[in-house]
Amino acid sequence: MQFSELVDAVRKNPLDVTITEDWGQGRASFGGLMVALQYEAMRAQVSSERALRSLAVTFVGPAEPGVPVSFEVEVLREGKAVSQVLGRAVQNGQVVTLVQGSFGGARESAVKVDSLPAPDMKAPEQCPLLPYIKGVTPEFMR
């Protein structure tokens, strides 16, 4: 299953997503994947005008590939400038990943820091593929 298909699954129904076994390492799904999918569920609950400002992650237990996961979201506080959001990835009734995020809008400041522009990047379909090497690269690279 492609990463984009998993993201689409979270967008369609975050409470019932099954991560395929090719996204696993041993008995657990890759942690970065769990965070990306939980973030996607959280992002959907916050105004697009509020950018992600911080993200704290706790891996509570392994998320077993092939078993449905529920990416739950609770907006803890929707303030004037910042939204505090808690995400829980739950599997078999147990929390496997906790993610707390702060999303905030732009605001006036006496501090001015010029940011560098984002680099130009090709679309994923235009990038060279990393070859699959059995025992070296993860199964999802196939």
Protein language model regions, located:
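Terminal targeting signals and extreme-terminal segments of soluble enzymes
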Residues: 1-142
